[in-house]
Amino acid sequence: MYLEKINGPEDVKKIKIDELPVLAQEIRDALLVRASKHGGHFGPNFGMVEATIALHYVFESPKDKIVYDVSHQSYPHKMLTGRKEAYLSEQHYDDVSGYTNPNESEHDFFTVGHTSTSVSLAAGLAKARDLKGENGNVIAVIGDGSLSGGEALEGLDFAAELQSNFIIIVNDNDMSIAENHGGLYQNLALLRKTDGQAECNLFKAMGLDYVYVDRGNDVAALIKAFKEVKDSTKPVVVHINTLKGKGYAPAEKCKEQWHYSGPFDIETGKPLFDNVEVDYSSVTCEYLLEKMKNDSSVVAITSGTPTVMGFTEDKRKEAGSQFVDVGIAEETAVALASGIAVNGGKPFYGVYSSFVQRTFDQVSQDVCINNSPITMVIYQGSVYGMNDVTHLGFQDIPMLSNIPNLVYLAPATKEEYLAMLDWSMEQTSYPVAIKLPGGPMISDGSRVTKDFGRLNRYEVVQTGEKIAIIGLGTFFELAKEAAKLLKEEAGINATVINPYYITGLDEALLTKLKQNHDTVITLEDGILDGGFGEKIARFYGASNMKVMNYGLKKEFLDRYDVDAVLKENHLTAEQIAEDVLSIL
């Protein structure tokens, strides 16, 4: 095997060009076995094997700096830069992250995981090189799906001003996570159709030189093209036409499904663990499709992640023009929603918590200053959500809850969520965001009659004394568990409160608690700094009420164990009960 002997890029260069396809197959074989057991990003890596080999064959990493956009396609890169054991040995599968990481290797320059950043990051490396009078190639590798992001276009626009070595590899597989959306993809299609010869050329129009490689999975053709642009003295785009999922028939056939995979059977491609349980994504999709049938003004919006809202390909077709995918462009998604709302439409935008920071300016400026009645639903905004350092989901409360005019809600159950949607989609007074709870969806079958238009009215679900526990969203169940333990272990009958509202205080209820309570506990599924609990603590201020805030520390966690993090932050019922008893 060639792969077993590769400890760095210098070993790739020792292989004859006509033998490199053998190495490519070995890489795919290793990726296939690992993915079948461990899961991970599948299609992007299978499509980039030859390009990665060619990059390390031609360039001199790490002197020549390669920056991968998103970096979810960096598995072959890791295999060729001293980390092959993490893909060949099951015992070492967890030794590396799913994205580039400078702590792992000198061949990785940034910890990244979001789209459309590579060109700007690499341009910065090139600018610093020029200022220091150094040499070396700087290469940005970006997939066509990422070109729909504004930062990518901003980076391309700036790149032309460098007037020095800067190479941009556009990996064009005619796909984002799902299908591509937007006018620029018509130009990419035209360039593919004309073998890169079309007069209308996005990249040339931006002042960049341009090279087209039709056979983007032919390692010899790629090596030839990369040698042509190596040590170039001005910015150049190398547009390579690749096949997402290449080398595994099920992935080639169903590219969207195989963007990312869990463990599966190699022979059939079928998942080892069927996820048949109903979740918030499927509930959302069915709710919106039903509303669309009776109301043509309802619009579901996604920014390149349609399945976050349950909109698989068949559901998107069913929704027709009432479903909009703006591409990986969160800013546009929010501004579009505001425009739709102002003109009488009923926009719904679903987004992962990890991408909320990309929406902040538009939520603040385009939505909340204008008081546009949009509905924005936050998915996986929880310690139970994604656990890569680039995809954390517990920072949205401080971001969103402090924007004026926004009503930020936190349901604890499916029934509460649907009731909030019923109110939000029909009201025209406020912009509304809804933070879905983490973990398995809870459905208690209850009928929720609460009028959410009467803002900031909490609900007391258990009346007690001395101790009041306010459990927000995900942690409402934890509040009930802690109260139960206090009753069982110390005979304390605690008050339990479901606050519903992240953005406002029920001052009347909080004031009333002073009559027969001396301690208030807040629980939130997010970082404490600037969060929900601090607002409660500030309300009680100089009074005699003790306030204990429970949530997460402000830190970047990476590939963490949920139970360990909860325990470290005293977010277990046993620890909360113990803390309460220690101060009585």
Regions found by a protein language model. Give the residues of each.
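A glycine-rich helix N-cap at a beta->alpha junction
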Residues: A86-V96, E161-M175, C368-Q380
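Peripheral docking tails and interdomain loops at the edges
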Residues: P263, G269-D274, G385-N387, V407, ...
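Active-site nucleophile and cofactor-binding loops and adjacent substrate-binding regions
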Residues: G39-M48, V67-H72, N101-S120, I142-S146, ...
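Cofactor-binding active-site loop characterized by glycine-rich and histidine/acidic residues
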Residues: H41-L162, V298, S303, T312-E313, ...
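Glycine/charged-rich beta-loop-alpha catalytic/anionic-binding loops adjacent to active sites
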Residues: D29-S36, D95-T111, G133-I139, T312-G327, ...
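Glycine-rich ThDP/TPP pyrophosphate-binding loop and its adjacent helix/strand module
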Residues: Q73, D108-F264, K270-E277, S282, ...
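Non-catalytic terminal/interface segments that mediate subunit docking, oligomerization
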Residues: Y248-Q357, Q362-S372, I470-G473
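N-terminal amphipathic, basic-rich helices that act as targeting or association modules
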Residues: M1-M79, R215
